[in-house]
Amino acid sequence: TKDIKALIDVGISYTKIKKALKEIDVNISEITHVFITHEHSDHIKGLKMLLKHHSPKVYLTEGTNSYLKLENANIIKALEKVVISDLSVLPIPLSHDAKEAVGFVFEKENKSICYITDTGYIISELISLLENHTLYYLESNYDPFTLLHSKRPYHLKKRIIDEKGHLSNEESAYYFSILKGDKTKYLIHSHISEECNTLKKIKETFDTVLRVQGEGTEFKRYYALPNESTELIIL
């Protein structure tokens, strides 16, 4: 927004974040806020170095901070809205094998972002809070057939499929089909497994589920890939 430049998670190195921000003409020193979903390394890898060089305000749950032990953290609670300048932030409780994982709904005026990743399912009672947002950043972690036939050990397969694991393409597509609304303009597929998923499988699954559910595809689709930046999206 005009007053806030924020990062959601810091899962890559400080150097890579600095480079990616430079591509959109943002200096890393301009980052004012950081929102952390949970403590797993692929979400906090660059946080220590970021805080060594800069002083953004960090928002995270008490459970997550019990692991990170940040002294000046801003503790947030699931389903308790935080208003920061011109931005409203609602932490959403998720089901993941972490201390206290959350997603987020960010709102400013009539534009909103729903950020949901690293969860085994979405709590049904919260669906109404997640409906009809402008942009969805939604986990499409794995294709079930590919995962089950992969060389990954059984315990890892079980962890991923578990209710505290990750969303499959089918699960993600189903949730999106019931969440999207007339305000929805963008979908970013995220947390995509390099070993157990493909962009083709994601697209085919989503197209099929949306067709069966009688939903259209009048939105722009992007894929968040590990070593690539998506194009800049202005809501």
Question: For the regions a protein language model found, what residue spans apply to each?
Answer:
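Metallo-beta-lactamase
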Residues: 60-111
